[in-house]
Design a protein with these regions (language model features):
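Short S/T/G/P-rich N-terminal loop/turn motif that feeds into the first structured element of a domain
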Residues: 1-71, 80-101
């Protein structure tokens, strides 16, 4: 069973944070490639009120934490984006059910 991970980064300037993501596309692609090798299944960003949210699916909580904790590339992007650290983390167990897609 997979683990869903919600990572909430507080940001003061959402426009600047989104521009940072666009300006650092190559680095984000590198991070994504490494994440897949470490157990990530899906990843996307979303915008909330005053927060940039990463919504991920991982093989396990441990796989996510081993990848995320002290990752210098993630630290670089979050710092450039003006995100407050540490982010809020939420872990949810996936539930297999008919109609899931």
């Amino acid at each position: 069973m997979s683990t869903l991970v919600i990572v909430r980064f507080l940001v003061a300037d959402m426009s600047a944070a989104k521009k940072t993501l666009a300006d650092n596309a190559a680095l984000l692609e590198e991070i994504g490639t490494e994440a897949k090798k470490s157990g990530a299944r899906h990843h996307r960003f979303a915008e909330g009120i005053g927060e940039l949210v990463a919504i991920d699916e991982w093989d396990s909580v441990e796989a996510f934490q081993n990848f995320f904790d002290d990752n210098p590339k993630i630290a670089t992007v979050t710092k450039k984006a003006g995100a407050q650290m540490p982010p809020s983390l939420e872990f949810l167990a996936g539930v297999e059910a008919a109609g899931t897609f």
